C-alpha cells in the first residue's frame, strides 16, 4: 500500500488505521464505514481562510475528521473527559506533571524538538487567550499542499518531556485541555509555532486541516476550515498568509489526481483552477462560512469545473470526492498530474493580471460503491465529460480519472440560491421558504433544454433563473415586505403546487423530450452510482453522441434527492474543462504540447488537405518558378498613374495629414474634475491634504512591465510639456529626463520607487502625484509575495509599492489610479472613496453635445450598436468557416488544447490567403473569406497611396509560445512568396521592444521626416501607415495604444473560455478608435454615445493621440491597377458567403499591360509626406468607367500580384461595382479597396484612383473578428438591455457577494455602476484590498486616493497630464497673492524743503536731524486716491491734476494689483496649516483644541464718560503674556518688556489687529512672518463675531469689543486699543516700579496692523558716496521679525510717537527710497507710542480716513511721525470683510430701490425713507460724494481750500482741505495768507471759540457746515461761536443723516459767508 512518504505502509500502521475505521463505524449511525485506504490521507480542503484564520478562536464550529466519519444525520457527540489521575496537576495551561505549557511563559526557553517533529500551538476552551505548546510528529500534520496528513497522532509534552503519546485523546488529557467535545487534533491543534528574529517562539500560520465532511442538507455546520500553508522543513521564518492556497502546487488536485505513474502520455488538463460559482451569501446550512467572510468565493463565468484527478500513486485507485480542489482566482495553479515534467516543487506565482478565475470546492460526499471510469473514454468521446455535482451524495470515482472532470460548482450555486436575499431578511422574511431542490433541478433541466448546440451554460444565467423563480413564487410576500412594516404573519400560500421528488424524474424527462436528445435524463433507483455507470456505458457505446447534457436523478429517499449533471457535448465539455486552467497553466499546457511534438499531427493533417501535397513543397516550387517576378509584378502593379511630387521629385501623399496635437475638450474637462476632487479633499474638515503648504508638483507614473507601454508613456510625458510647466526641467527637455517620471513595474522598480519615497520625504513642500496607470493589472496582495518571493519577485509588486505604509501615511503623496476597468477597485473593501472616483464624461445629454469634439469616440458600445443596427455591414464579425474547422479538428484531436488548434488553423488560413493573393488561386479553398479579405487589403493598401501608406492587421495571440509559432510560420511563407518588402510582420510582446526591418524603418523615417540615423520605432503608434501584421502576444494587453492605420483587429484566438468582463473588454478595447466627426461614417451607428459608455465598455489605458512627430499623409491622385471583383454577401460570417474564396470573376492581365506611369515602388516608398487636402483624379482627360467582369479568367503566374482578390471591404451597403453608373465614392473602402486596372488604352477598364488607406482609416473604425462564443456573448442582451458580457463576473480577482443581486441596468451612470459593484462584489483573499476591512475601521477609505476611469484609447493619459499642469498652476496660485501695486499719489505736490534727511546710509533716524524736517501734510497712500487733498500753504493746483470723483457704483472698483509668490516670511489665513505652525495655530493632532479662558478687563475712559469693560479670551498656552491676581484669577495686566531689553528672539511690541468679517481670510497667522520669534498677537473683534473667530483661531488671544460697538467702524477699535494699552502701560509701570524698574523704562509701543498685511520687504541701497546723489538699490523680502527688531533697536525710539513704513509698489521710484526716513503720514502698519500720544485720541466714531485724522492730530500735538522708507509692507487684496462689511440699506424690508449717496441725508422731520446704517457712516459717505452741495465754491478750487477744524473728513478729490487744530500750543500751518472757500466744524468742542475762528479769512459766498449730535447742540454751537455775525443762516439749510430717531442721526446746518 503506497503512501506519500514511504514506499510501503508498515503493518502496525495498517492495523491502526483499520482499528480507527472500525471505531468510527461503531460510533456512526450508518453501517457503511469509510474506505480504509482513503483514511490513510486526510485530504485537506484548501479553502479560503475562515475567521479563525484571522486570529479569532471564539467562533469555531464542530469539525469532522477522518476519525469520526459521521454520516449526515448524526448530531455531534458530547464528550465526557475521563477523571484525571489522583494527585496530578489540573490547572489550565499546565500539564498533569505541573509544567507550564503556555506560549507566553516558555516562548524564550529552549525546547528540545526531536527530528521529524514540529512545535504547534493547541487551543484550550478554558484558556481562549493562550496557546499551549506541543511537539507533534509532522507526518500527522498536513503536508506542503495541505494534503496527506496521516491519520492518528504522535506527540510529546514539552513541559515534562513525556513522549510517545499515540492518541490525541490521551495527549489532550495530559495537557489539561478540558474539552467538552471530542478531542480531535484538527479542532485543537491550531497554529505552527516559529521563532522570530529575536529567537522567541511566536504564533505562526494556521495549520491547514481539512474541513468537515458534508453532513447532509438538513444538518450541515461547516464546509471548510482554515486554509493554510504548512511549514517548511525549517521551523523558522514561516510567512503567515492563512487565506490562500499554495499557488502553483495545484491543491485542487484530489487524491489520485497526481500522474498515475509514467505511463500517462499527455499532461492532464483537469486541474481545477477555473471560475467558481459561489458568489453570494452563504447558505444558512454553512454558518461558519457566513461568519468567516467566506461568502466571497470564486464565481464562474462558464459553469465551473473541478477535475477529478487520480491519486498520488498508480496503485491507489480510490478517490473520495470530498477531497476538494480549491484554488483562489488570484493564483496560477500547477498542472495537477505533470510531476514528471515539472521537477521543481516551488510554486510559480504569476503576474496578477494574468490569473483567471478558479474553482472553489465544496463538500461532495461520496457514498455507496465506487464508480469506475472506463478506459479510453476520452478517445471514444472526443472530449472529457464534465460532471457537476448537484444535490445529495456523490459516489466515489475510480479508474481512468484523467478522462473525466468533476466540479462542485453547481452544488454551490444550488446552496447559494437557497439562501434568502439580504434585502428581505431585514424585513423578517424568514417565513419565506427558499426555492426547493426539486424546483432547482427542474429549472436547470429547462435551462439546458433551451440552450443551442453552440451555446455554453453560464452560471450567471442559472442564478438569474433561480432568482426570478423565487421572486415570482413569493411575489405577494415581497410586496408586503416592501410596502408595510415587518409583521409576523404566515407565508402566503403559493398557487402553484410544489414539485415532489416522485414527480421530478418524470417532469425532467418530459422537459427533455422536446430537445432531440440534447438533454438526456437518467433516473436511478438507489444511488447516483447507477446513473453514472449507465452514463459511462452509453458513452462508450456511442449512444450519447447527440447528447450535450446528461441529468442523473436519484429520488429514492423520502425527502431528499441526489443529482448530478454531466456535460458530454464535445464543444461544451472542451470549453468548460479548459476554462479551469489559469493563464499560467494554459501557457504551460500549450508549451508542453509544442515541445513534446503533439502538434505535429496537426501539420500532417493540413498537409493531407493540400491537393499538391505538403504546403511547404508547394511554396518552394512557387518560389523557384517565380523568383524575380513577384517583386517586379507587385512593383508594376503598385505604380501610380498620377502623383503629386515634392520639390525633390518624390511622390507625396496628399490625402492624409497628421492629427494636430493639443488637449481636447474632454481631456480638459476630466483634468478639471480631477482638480476639483483634489480640492475637495483639501477643503474637507479631515485636513488630509494641505494644498497651501505645497510649492510645486512632482509625479511618478507607474505602468505595467510592457516596453511598448513604457516608451509610449515616456513619449506622452516628453511631448506634453508637463515637465516644463511643473518646473521640473528646463528647455530643452530630453527623453532621458522624461524617463525619470515613468516607472515600469518590473523587478527593478523597487529601487526606483524607494528613491521616489525618499524624495517625497525630503521635500515636504512638494506635492507628489503617484499615478498608477492601467491600475486593474496586478492586484495580488503583497502577502503572496511574502510567502513566495523566491519563485517570482514581481508577485504583489503593486501592493508592496503603492500600498506601503510610507505611501499611505505621506501627507504629500496623492495616489491616482487610472484604468479602463475599475471593477476590481470597486469592491466592498476598496481603499478608494466613491466620492473620489472620476468618470469620463458623456458626450451627449438629452441630445445636446456637451463637448464639441472634432472626432467621435468609437468604443465597444458603438461597435455593438453598429453591428446590431443592420443598416450596414457589421464591424463585429465571426468567421463561421474558421469556427467549423476548429470544431472539427477539436473532435479529431481531443488531447490538444483548443488554443493550439485555433492558432494552427488561423495561421494556415493566413498562409493560404497570402499564397492565393500571390498567384496560387487553388489555395483559396484552404482559407476563409474573412482571412482572404484581410490579406488582400493588406497587400493592396500600399498601392493606393503614392507614398506606400498601408494598413495594420492586429493578430491577437495571447499565448506567447503560439505567437512565436505564428510569427515564424507567417514570416516563412512571406519569404517564400517574396513579399518581404510589401508588408512587415511584427511580433509584439510586453517584455520586449519592437523589431522592424531596415526597409520599413527607412520608410517610416521618410514619412515622419526623421533625420536621426539611429532611430527605431519603439511604440505601435510610430508604426502608423506601415503595412504590417502585428502579432500581439501576452495574456493581457498592458495599455499599448495602436495607430490609426489599424484596419483589422483579429481576435479569433483570444481565450474565450475565461469569461470575465475585464478580460473581454480589454481585448475588445484594442479596437477602440476615434473617427472624424465631420465625415459621416460609411457604416456604424449614429454619432450618439450611450450615457453609460464611460462605465460599461472600457479597456486599455492609453490616449489615441500622440502618435509620432512626423506628418503622415494619405490619399492618392493616381489610378490603381487590379482586377474588379464582386463583393461578398452581407453575412456576418464566412459560411454564408457564396464566394467562399472560390470561383469569382477576374480580369486577365499580362505583364505587358502593367505599364508604369510613375516612379517604381522603391522610389515611391521613399517619398516624404506633405500636408494637403485629399485629391482624387486630378489627371486631365482621365476617363473613369466601370465594368464588371463576369466570367472566370485565367490567372497569370507571372503577375501574382494581380490575381482576383475578393474585396469585402467595400462596406457601403450597396453593390457599387455591379452598377456601371455607380459613383466613384462608393469604391472607396476603409482598409484597401479592390484593385482596379488603369491602362492608357481606350478600351481598357479604368477606375478612379483609390484613396490612401490612412485617410480612410481616420473616418472608419477597424473591423473586429471574434470567436463565436464571444460574439454571441456581446450581441445577446439580458433583461436589462445590456450585453450579457456586462453581467459576467467583473474581474477574476473579485467575487460576488450574493446570487440575489439585481442585474446591471443600461440606464446606470458611471457612479451608479460603481456603487453596484461596491455593494455586490468583494475581493478574493489574494486581492490586495482583501484585508482592508480587517483593520476594524468602518470607513477604511484612503483619504488621498483617487480613481479615474474611462474607455480605452480615449485619452486618459493626456487628461491626467493636463491635470498635473493645472494642479501645478493652482498650487502656484495658492502660493501667490494679489497684492496692491499702486504708485504713490500726489507726488507732484510733495513739499519741497531745504531740510531733507541727507544721511543716506543711516540705519536709524538721527533725532536732531529728524526734528528739523518739516511734516508732509500731503497724503501719498494710493488707497486715498479719492480723498481730499490736504493743503499746507496756498497752492496753485490745476483741476485736471486731481482725478474726477468716482461714481458711487465705483465705490469698490478693483484697484491695481500684482500677483506675488508668497515667501517663507508671509502671513497666512486659516487655510494654511503646515506642520511647523500647527501648534501655533492650535490644530496639532497630538494636542486637544486649545482651551481658553474669558477675562474681564475694566478701565475708566473720560472720552466715553463711563467705565469700559473689555473681554479677553486667552488660550492656556498664552497666559504667560498676562499677569493674574492668582493662577486662574482676575486679569490684572498684560506684561510689557523693558526698553533696555535686548533679545533677538522676542518682539517687544504687542501686535493688535482689528478685524471684522475676515475670520477665514484675515492674515492672522504670523508664525512664519515672525520667523518663529516669540511675540504677542491680539485679535480685536466685535462681540457678535467672537464665536466664529474663536472657532477658526483657537490659539489666538481675542480682545472683544463691547456690544455697543457692534456697528462701529475701525475708529472705535483703534480708539479702544489705544485707551486699553495706555491704561495697561500705567498698570505695568506701577507693577514693575515695585520691582525697581523706572516707569520710563517700560516699553510704551504697540503695533496696530491691518489684517491684510501679507509680506514685508527691505530695500538694500548702495550709495555711491556723499557727493554723488546716484545710488543703486534692490528690494528683498524679509521677515516681520527682522523689521521689528530693527525698528525697536532705533536710538531714542521713545521720542517718536508714530513709526511706519512705505506701501510696496512695483514701480517705486529711486527717490522714494533714496531718503531713508520721512516725516509724513503712516498707514496700515504702525508702531504707536501710547505714552507720548496719551492726549491724542482716535475718533471712535470714524469709519474711513481715521488714520489720516489721527496722523494730523499727532503732528499738530508737536509729536514726531517717522516713516522708514526702506521698509515696505505688501497688502493682500481681500474681497470680503473689512470696510465691505458695512452695507447701507433701507429700513423698509420690502424696498428694492437702490440707495444712492444723495439719499444719505434728508431734511429734518421729513418723510424720507430711513436707512439702516450708522449716522457717522452716512455722513462720511455723503461728504465723499456730495460735499460740493455744501461747498460749491470749493469745487476744483484748490487754492482756496475748505478750513477743517480739529478733524479731517474726506470731501472728495475735487475739494481740498486745510487742517488746523484748536488746541493750545498746537502746530498749525500759517493761514494768514490763505483765503478759504468754506468752513467745516465737526462736533467741535470747547477749545473752538469765536476768537479762534476770527483769525481766518473766507471768500465772499464761502459756505459753512456745522455738524452736531442733535439740533439743540447745533443751535448752541451757532450762538457760542457767534457765527451769525459773519454767516447767513436759512431754515431750509438744516439737514440730518437719514436715520430714524432711535438711531441718533447727525444734524447739519449750512450758511453763507456775508
Swiss-Prot record:
The gene is Greb1. Residues 292-303, 1134-1146, 1224-1235 have a biased composition (Low complexity). This is Protein GREB1. It is found in: Membrane. May play a role in estrogen-stimulated cell proliferation. Keywords: Membrane, Transmembrane, Transmembrane helix. It comes from Mus musculus. Belongs to the GREB1 family. InterPro entries: GREB1, GREB1-like_2nd, GREB1-like_C, GREB1-like_cpSF2, GREB1_N, TAGT. Residues 48-83, 238-342, 1083-1235 are annotated as: Disordered. Residues 59-68 have a biased composition (Acidic residues). Pfam families: cpSF2-GREB1, GREB1_2nd, GREB1_C, GREB1_N, TAGT.
Amino acid at each position: 500500500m503506497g503512501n506519500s512518504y514511504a514506499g510501503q505502509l508498515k503493518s502496525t500502521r495498517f492495523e491502526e488505521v483499520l482499528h480507527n475505521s472500525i471505531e468510527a463505524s461503531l460510533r456512526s449511525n450508518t453501517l457503511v464505514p469509510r474506505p480504509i485506504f482513503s483514511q490513510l490521507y486526510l485530504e485537506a480542503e484548501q479553502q479560503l481562510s475562515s475567521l479563525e484564520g484571522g486570529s479569532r478562536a471564539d467562533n469555531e464550529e464542530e469539525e469532522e475528521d477522518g476519525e469520526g466519519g459521521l454520516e449526515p444525520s448524526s448530531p455531534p457527540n458530547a464528550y465526557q473527559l475521563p477523571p484525571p489521575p489522583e494527585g496530578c496537576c489540573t490547572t489550565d495551561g499546565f500539564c498533569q506533571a505541573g509544567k507550564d505549557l503556555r506560549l507566553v511563559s516558555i516562548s524564550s526557553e529552549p525546547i528540545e524538538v526531536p527530528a521529524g517533529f514540529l512545535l504547534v500551538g493547541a487551543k484550550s476552551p478554558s484558556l481562549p487567550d493562550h496557546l499551549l505548546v506541543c511537539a507533534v510528529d509532522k507526518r500527522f500534520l498536513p503536508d506542503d499542499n495541505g494534503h496527506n496528513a496521516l491519520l492518528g497522532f504522535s506527540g510529546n509534552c514539552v513541559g515534562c518531556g513525556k513522549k510517545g503519546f499515540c492518541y490525541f485523546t490521551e495527549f489532550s488529557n495530559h495537557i489539561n485541555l478540558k474539552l467538552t467535545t471530542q478531542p480531535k487534533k484538527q479542532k485543537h491543534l491550531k497554529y505552527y509555532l516559529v521563532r522570530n528574529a529575536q529567537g522567541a517562539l511566536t504564533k505562526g500560520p494556521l495549520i491547514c486541516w481539512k474541513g468537515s465532511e458534508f453532513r447532509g442538507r438538513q444538518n450541515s455546520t461547516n464546509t471548510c476550515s482554515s486554509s493554510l500553508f504548512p511549514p517548511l522543513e525549517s521551523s523558522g521564518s514561516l510567512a503567515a498568509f492563512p487565506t490562500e492556497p499554495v499557488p502553483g502546487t495545484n491543491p485542487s488536485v484530489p487524491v489520485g489526481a497526481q500522474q498515475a505513474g509514467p505511463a500517462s502520455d499527455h499532461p492532464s488538463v483537469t486541474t481545477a483552477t477555473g471560475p467558481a460559482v459561489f458568489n453570494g451569501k452563504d447558505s444558512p446550512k454553512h454558518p461558519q462560512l457566513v461568519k468567516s467572510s467566506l461568502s466571497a468565493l470564486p464565481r464562474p463565468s462558464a459553469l465551473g469545473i473541478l477535475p477529478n484527478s487520480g491519486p498520488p500513486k498508480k496503485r491507489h485507485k480510490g478517490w473520495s470526492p470530498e477531497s476538494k480542489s480549491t484554488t483562489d482566482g488570484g493564483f496560477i495553479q500547477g498542472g495537477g498530474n505533470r510531476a514528471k515534467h515539472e521537477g521543481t516543487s516551488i510554486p510559480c506565482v504569476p503576474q496578477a493580471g494574468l490569473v483567471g478565475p478558479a474553482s472553489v470546492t465544496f463538500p461532495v460526499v461520496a457514498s455507496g460503491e465506487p464508480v469506475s471510469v472506463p478506459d479510453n473514454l476520452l478517445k471514444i468521446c472526443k472530449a472529457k465529460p464534465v460532471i457537476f455535482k448537484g444535490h445529495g451524495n456523490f459516489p466515489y470515482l475510480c479508474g481512468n480519472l484523467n478522462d473525466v472532470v468533476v466540479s462542485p460548482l453547481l452544488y454551490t450555486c444550488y446552496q447559494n440560491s437557497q439562501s434568502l436575499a439580504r434585502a428581505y431578511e431585514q424585513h423578517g422574511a424568514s417565513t419565506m421558504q427558499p426555492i426547493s431542490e426539486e424546483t432547482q433541478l427542474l429549472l436547470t433541466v429547462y435551462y439546458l433544454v433551451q440552450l443551442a448546440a453552440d451555446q455554453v451554460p453560464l452560471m450567471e444565467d442559472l442564478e438569474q433563473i433561480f432568482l426570478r423563480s423565487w421572486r415570482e413564487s413569493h411575489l405577494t410576500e415581497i410586496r408586503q415586505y416592501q410596502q408595510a412594516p415587518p409583521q409576523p404573519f404566515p407565508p402566503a400560500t403559493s398557487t402553484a403546487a410544489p414539485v415532489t421528488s416522485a414527480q421530478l424524474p418524470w417532469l425532467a424527462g418530459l422537459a427533455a423530450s422536446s430537445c432531440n436528445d440534447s438533454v438526456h435524463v437518467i433516473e436511478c433507483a438507489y444511488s447516483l452510482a447507477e446513473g453514472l455507470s449507465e452514463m459511462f456505458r452509453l458513452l462508450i457505446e456511442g449512444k450519447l453522441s447527440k447528447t450535450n447534457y446528461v441529468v442523473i436523478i436519484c429520488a429514492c429517499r423520502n425527502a431528499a434527492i441526489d443529482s448530478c449533471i454531466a456535460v458530454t457535448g464535445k464543444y461544451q465539455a472542451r470549453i468548460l474543462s479548459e476554462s479551469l486552467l489559469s493563464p499560467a497553466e494554459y501557457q504551460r499546457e500549450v508549451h508542453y504540447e509544442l515541445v513534446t511534438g503533439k502538434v505535429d499531427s496537426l501539420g500532417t493533417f493540413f498537409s493531407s488537405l493540400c491537393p499538391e501535397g505538403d504546403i511547404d513543397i508547394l511554396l518552394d516550387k512557387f518560389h523557384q518558378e517565380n523568383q524575380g517576378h513577384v517583386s517586379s509584378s507587385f512593383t508594376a502593379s503598385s505604380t501610380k498613374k498620377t502623383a503629386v511630387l515634392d520639390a525633390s521629385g518624390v511622390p507625396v501623399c496628399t490625402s492624409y495629414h497628421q492629427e494636430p496635437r493639443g488637449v481636447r475638450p474632454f481631456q480638459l474637462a476630466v483634468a478639471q474634475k480631477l482638480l476639483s476632487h483634489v480640492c475637495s479633499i483639501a477643503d474637507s474638515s479631515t485636513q488630509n491634504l494641505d494644498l497651501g503648504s505645497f510649492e510645486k508638483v512632482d509625479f511618478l507614473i507607474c505602468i505595467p512591465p510592457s516596453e511598448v507601454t513604457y516608451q509610449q508613456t515616456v513619449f506622452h510625458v516628453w511631448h506634453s510639456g508637463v515637465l516644463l510647466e511643473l518646473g521640473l526641467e528646463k528647455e530643452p527637455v530630453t527623453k532621458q529626463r522624461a524617463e525619470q517620471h515613468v516607472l515600469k513595474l518590473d523587478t527593478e522598480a523597487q529601487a526606483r520607487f524607494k528613491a521616489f519615497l525618499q524624495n517625497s520625504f525630503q521635500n515636504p513642500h512638494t506635492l507628489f502625484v503617484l499615478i498608477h496607470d492601467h491600475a486593474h493589472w496586478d492586484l495580488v496582495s503583497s502577502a503572496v509575495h511574502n510567502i513566495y518571493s523566491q519563485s517570482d519577485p514581481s508577485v504583489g509588486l503593486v501592493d508592496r509599492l503603492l500600498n506601503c505604509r510610507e505611501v499611505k501615511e505621506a501627507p504629500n503623496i496623492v495616489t491616482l489610479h487610472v484604468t479602463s476597468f475599475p471593477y476590481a477597485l470597486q469592491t466592498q473593501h476598496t481603499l478608494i472613496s466613491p466620492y473620489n472616483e472620476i468618470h469620463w464624461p458623456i458626450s451627449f445629454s438629452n441630445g445636446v453635445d456637451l463637448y464639441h469634439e472634432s472626432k467621435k469616440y468609437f468604443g465597444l458600445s458603438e461597435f455593438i450598436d453598429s453591428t446590431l443596427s443592420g443598416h450596414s455591414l457589421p464591424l463585429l464579425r465571426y468567421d463561421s468557416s474558421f469556427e467549423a474547422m476548429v470544431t472539427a479538428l477539436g473532435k479529431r484531436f481531443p488531447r490538444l488544447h483548443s488554443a493550439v488548434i485555433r492558432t494552427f488553423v488561423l495561421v494556415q488560413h493566413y498562409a493560404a490567403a497570402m499564397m492565393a493573393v500571390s498567384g496560387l488561386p487553388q489555395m483559396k479553398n484552404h482559407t476563409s473569406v474573412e482571412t482572404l479579405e484581410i490579406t488582400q487589403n493588406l497587400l493592396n493598401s500600399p498601392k493606393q497611396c503614392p507614398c506606400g501608406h498601408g494598413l495594420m492587421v492586429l493578430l491577437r495571440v495571447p499565448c506567447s509560445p503560439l505567437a512565436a509559432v505564428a510569427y515564424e510560420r507567417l514570416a516563412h511563407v512571406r519569404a517564400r512568396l517574396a513579399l518581404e518588402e510589401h508588408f512587415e510582420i511584427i511580433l509584439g510582446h510586453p517584455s520586449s521592444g519592437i523589431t522592424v526591418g531596415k526597409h520599413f524603418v527607412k520608410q517610416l523615417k521618410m514619412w515622419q521626416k526623421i533625420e536621426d540615423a539611429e532611430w527605431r520605432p519603439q511604440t505601435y503608434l510610430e508604426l502608423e501607415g506601415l503595412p504590417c501584421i502585428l502579432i500581439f502576444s501576452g495574456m493581457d494587453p498592458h495599455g499599448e495604444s495602436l495607430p490609426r492605420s489599424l484596419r483589422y483587429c483579429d481576435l479569433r484566438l483570444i481565450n474565450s473560455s475565461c469569461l470575465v468582463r475585464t478580460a473581454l473588454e480589454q481585448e475588445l478595447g484594442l479596437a477602440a478608435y476615434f473617427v472624424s466627426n465631420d465625415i459621416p461614417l460609411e457604416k456604424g451607428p449614429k454619432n450618439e454615445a450611450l450615457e453609460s459608455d464611460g462605465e460599461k465598455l472600457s479597456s486599455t489605458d492609453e490616449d489615441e493621440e500622440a502618435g509620432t512627430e512626423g506628418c503622415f499623409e494619405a490619399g492618392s491622385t493616381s489610378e490603381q491597377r487590379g482586377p474588379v471583383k464582386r463583393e461578398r454577401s452581407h453575412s456576418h460570417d464566412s459560411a454564408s458567403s457564396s464566394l467562399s474564396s472560390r470561383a469569382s470573376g477576374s480580369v486577365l492581365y499580362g505583364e505587358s499591360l502593367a505599364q508604369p506611369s510613375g516612379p517604381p515602388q522603391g522610389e515611391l516608398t521613399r517619398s516624404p509626406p506633405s500636408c494637403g487636402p485629399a485629391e482624387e483624379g486630378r489627371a486631365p482627360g482621365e476617363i473613369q468607367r466601370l465594368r464588371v467582369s463576369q466570367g472566370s479568367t485565367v490567372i497569370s503566374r507571372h503577375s501574382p500580384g494581380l490575381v482576383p482578390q475578393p474585396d469585402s471591404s467595400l462596406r457601403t451597403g450597396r453593390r457599387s461595382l455591379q452598377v456601371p453608373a455607380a459613383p466613384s465614392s462608393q469604391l472607396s473602402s476603409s482598409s484597401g479597396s479592390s484593385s482596379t486596372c488603369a491602362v492608357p488604352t481606350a478600351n481598357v477598364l479604368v477606375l478612379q484612383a483609390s484613396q490612401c488607406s490612412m485617410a480612410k482609416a481616420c473616418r472608419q473604425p477597424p473591423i473586429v473578428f471574434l470567436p463565436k462564443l464571444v460574439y454571441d456573448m456581446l450581441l445577446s442582451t439580458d433583461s436589462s438591455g445590456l450585453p450579457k458580457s456586462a453581467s459576467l463576473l467583473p474581474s477574476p480577482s473579485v467575487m460576488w457577494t450574493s446570487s440575489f443581486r439585481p442585474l446591471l441596468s443600461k440606464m446606470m451612470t458611471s457612479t451608479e455602476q460603481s456603487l453596484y459593484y461596491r455593494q455586490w462584489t468583494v475581493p478574493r483573499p489574494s486581492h490586495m484590498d482583501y484585508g482592508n476591512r480587517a483593520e476594524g475601521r468602518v470607513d477604511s477609505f484612503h483619504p488621498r486616493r483617487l480613481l479615474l476611469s474611462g474607455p480605452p484609447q480615449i485619452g486618459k493619459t493626456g487628461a491626467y497630464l493636463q491635470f498635473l499642469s493645472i494642479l501645478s498652476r493652482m498650487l502656484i496660485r495658492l502660493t501667490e497673492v494679489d497684492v496692491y501695486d499702486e504708485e504713490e499719489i500726489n507726488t507732484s505736490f510733495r513739499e519741497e524743503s531745504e531740510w531733507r534727511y541727507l544721511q543716506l546710509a543711516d540705519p536709524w533716524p538721527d533725532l536732531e536731524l529728524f526734528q528739523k524736517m518739516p511734516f508732509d501734510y500731503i497724503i501719498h497712500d494710493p488707497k486715498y486716491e479719492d480723498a481730499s487733498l490736504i493743503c499746507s500753504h496756498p497752492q496753485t493746483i490745476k483741476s485736471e491734476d486731481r482725478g474726477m470723483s468716482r461714481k458711487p457704483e465705483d465705490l469698490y472698483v478693483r484697484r491695481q494689483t500684482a500677483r506675488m509668490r508668497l515667501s517663507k516670511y508671509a502671513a497666512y489665513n486659516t487655510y494654511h496649516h503646515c506642520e511647523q505652525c500647527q501648534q501655533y495655530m492650535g490644530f496639532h493632532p497630538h494636542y486637544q483644541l486649545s482651551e481658553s479662558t474669558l477675562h474681564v478687563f475694566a478701565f475708566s475712559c473720560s472720552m466715553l464718560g463711563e467705565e469700559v469693560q473689555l473681554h479677553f479670551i486667552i488660550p492656556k498656552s498664552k497666559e504667560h503674556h498676562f499677569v493674574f491676581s492668582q493662577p486662574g484669577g482676575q486679569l490684572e495686566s498684560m506684561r510689557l518688556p523693558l526698553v533696555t531689553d535686548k533679545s533677538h528672539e522676542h518682539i517687544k511690541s504687542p501686535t493688535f489687529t482689528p478685524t471684522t468679517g475676515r475670520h477665514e481670510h484675515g492674515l492672522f497667522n504670523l508664525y512664519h512672518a515672525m520667523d518663529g520669534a516669540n511675540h504677542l498677537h491680539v485679535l480685536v473683534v466685535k462681540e457678535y463675531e467672537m464665536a466664529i473667530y474663536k472657532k477658526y483661531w483657537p490659539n489666538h488671544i481675542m480682545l472683544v469689543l463691547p456690544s455697543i460697538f457692534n456697528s462701529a467702524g475701525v475708529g472705535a477699535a483703534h480708539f479702544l486699543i489705544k485707551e486699553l494699552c495706555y491704561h495697561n502701560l500705567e498698570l505695568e509701570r506701577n507693577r514693575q516700579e515695585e520691582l525697581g524698574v523706572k516707569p520710563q523704562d517700560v516699553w510704551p509701543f504697540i503695533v496696530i496692523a491691518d489684517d491684510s498685511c501679507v509680506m514685508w520687504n527691505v530695500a538694500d541701497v548702495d550709495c555711491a558716496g556723499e557727493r554723488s546723489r546716484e545710488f543703486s538699490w534692490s528690494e528683498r523680502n524679509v521677515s516681520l521679525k527682522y523689521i521689528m527688531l530693527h525698528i525697536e533697536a532705533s536710538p531714542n525710539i521713545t521720542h517718536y510717537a508714530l513709526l511706519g513704513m512705505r506701501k510696496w509698489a512695483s514701480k517705486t521710484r529711486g527717490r522714494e527710497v533714496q531718503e531713508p526716513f520721512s516725516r509724513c503720514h503712516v498707514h496700515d502698519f504702525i508702531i504707536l507710542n501710547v505714552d507720548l500720544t496719551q492726549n491724542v485720541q482716535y475718533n471712535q466714531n470714524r469709519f474711513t480716513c481715521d488714520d489720516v485724522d489721527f496722523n494730523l492730530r499727532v503732528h499738530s500735538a508737536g509729536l514726531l511721525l517717522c516713516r522708514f522708507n526702506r521698509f515696505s509692507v505688501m497688502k493682500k487684496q481681500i474681497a470680503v470683510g473689512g470696510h465691505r462689511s458695512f452695507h447701507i440699506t433701507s429700513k423698509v424690508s420690502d424696498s428694492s430701490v437702490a440707495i444712492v449717496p444723495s439719499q444719505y441725508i434728508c431734511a429734518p422731520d421729513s418723510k424720507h425713507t430711513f436707512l439702516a446704517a450708522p449716522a457717522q457712516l452716512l455722513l462720511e459717505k455723503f461728504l465723499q460724494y456730495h460735499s460740493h452741495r455744501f461747498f460749491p465754491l470749493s469745487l476744483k478750487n484748490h487754492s482756496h481750500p475748505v478750513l477743517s477744524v480739529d478733524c479731517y473728513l474726506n470731501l472728495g478729490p475735487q475739494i481740498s482741505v486745510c487742517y488746523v487744530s484748536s488746541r493750545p500750543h498746537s502746530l498749525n500751518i500759517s493761514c494768514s495768507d490763505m483765503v478759504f472757500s468754506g468752513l467745516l466744524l465737526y462736533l467741535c468742542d470747547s477749545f473752538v471759540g469765536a476768537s479762534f475762528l476770527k483769525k481766518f479769512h473766507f471768500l465772499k459766498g464761502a459756505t459753512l457746515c456745522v455738524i452736531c449730535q442733535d439740533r439743540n447742540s447745533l443751535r448752541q454751537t451757532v450762538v457760542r461761536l457767534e457765527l451769525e455775525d459773519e454767516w447767513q443762516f436759512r431754515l431750509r439749510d438744516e439737514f440730518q443723516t437719514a436715520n430714524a430717531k432711535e438711531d441718533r442721526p447727525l444734524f447739519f446746518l449750512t450758511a453763507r459767508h456775508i
